[in-house]
């Protein structure tokens, strides 16, 4: 039985609409997670949802080294357009290695390692995250059927094994630019992510991203 607890709840107005922010705590680790909820999610219809792992650099500092910030904004926008849904903000920074170690991994990437090689060089697995807590959060929220906004097959498999019915995978290919194309390529080739890239419709326009993405 899960030890995660629902400990706080309030309204949260955002640029994408008014959500209900729900706070969860896992006593064993003292780790806190939150979910943004919009509309009625307790009927029998599948719920549009996103499991979004924490990324300070992408979500708050607008880093172009990953696609995280773009995925966060797109997911919230799509949930708002649907009028109902859930975004779980999963507090596993840097694929579970933490912020400082992520910066160390970035330094190794500056020297030529890819995102997986950098983690391994620091003594970590390619992905240290545990998504099972997200299934517990869905259960506490009363969500049983999910249309999951993700490119990550591991999230889907973990939810299914934990009793959450994933009725559809909704692709989330956004935010590609010349700084993260190799990162996305690595996730697709080495981690099996369902990523469509080197495609003009997914490229972002910004002052620093005008160069053509190099062909592989």
From Swiss-Prot:
Top EC class for this record: hydrolase
Annotated GO biological process: riboflavin biosynthetic process
Chain residues that bind Zn(2+): 55, 66, 68
SUPFAM superfamilies linked to this entry: RibA-like (SSF142695)
Cofactor detail note: Binds 1 zinc ion per subunit.
Active site per the UniProt annotation: 127 (proton acceptor), 129 (nucleophile)
Binding site for GTP: 50-54, 71, 93-95, 115, 150, 155
EC number in record: 3.5.4.25
Organism superkingdom: Bacteria
Cellular compartments per GO CC: cytosol
Signal sequence segment: none
Cofactor(s), by name: Zn(2+)
RNA-binding among keywords: no
GO molecular function, one term: zinc ion binding
Catalytic activity field: GTP + 4 H2O = 2,5-diamino-6-hydroxy-4-(5-phosphoribosylamino)-pyrimidine + formate + 2 phosphate + 3 H(+)
This protein's record includes keyword GTP-binding: yes
Keywords tagged on the record: GTP-binding, Hydrolase, Metal-binding, Nucleotide-binding, Riboflavin biosynthesis, Zinc
Pathway given in the UniProt record: Cofactor biosynthesis; riboflavin biosynthesis; 5-amino-6-(D-ribitylamino)uracil from GTP: step 1/4
InterPro entries assigned to the protein according to its UniProt record, in alphabetical order: GTP_cyclohydro_II, RibA, RibA-like_sf
Record family assignment: Belongs to the GTP cyclohydrolase II family.
Function description: Catalyzes the conversion of GTP to 2,5-diamino-6-ribosylamino-4(3H)-pyrimidinone 5'-phosphate (DARP), formate and pyrophosphate.
Protein name: GTP cyclohydrolase-2
Protein's organism: Histophilus somni (strain 2336) (Haemophilus somnus)
């Amino acid at each position: 039985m899960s030890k995660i607890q629902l400990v706080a709840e309030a309204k949260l107005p955002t640029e994408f609409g008014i959500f209900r922010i729900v706070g969860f705590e896992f006593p064993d680790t003292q780790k806190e997670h939150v979910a943004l909820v919009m509309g009625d999610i307790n009927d029998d219809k599948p719920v549009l949802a996103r499991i979004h792992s924490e990324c300070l650099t992408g979500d708050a500092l607008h880093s172009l080294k990953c696609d995280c910030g773009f995925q966060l904004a797109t997911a919230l926008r799509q949930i708002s357009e649907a009028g109902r849904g859930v975004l779980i903000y999963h507090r596993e920074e840097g694929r579970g290695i933490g912020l400082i170690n992520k910066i160390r991994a970035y330094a190794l990437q500056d020297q030529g390692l890819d995102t997986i090689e950098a983690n391994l060089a620091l003594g970590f697995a390619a992905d240290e995250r545990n998504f099972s807590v997200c299934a517990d959060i869905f259960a506490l929220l009363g969500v049983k059927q999910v249309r999951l906004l993700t490119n990550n097959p591991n999230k889907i498999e973990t939810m299914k094994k934990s009793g959450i019915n994933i009725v559809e995978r909704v692709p989330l290919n956004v935010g590609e630019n010349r700084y993260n194309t190799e990162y996305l390529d690595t996730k697709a080739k080495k981690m099996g992510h369902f990523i469509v890239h080197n495609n003009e419709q997914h490229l972002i326009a910004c002052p620093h991203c005008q160069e053509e993405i190099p062909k592989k």
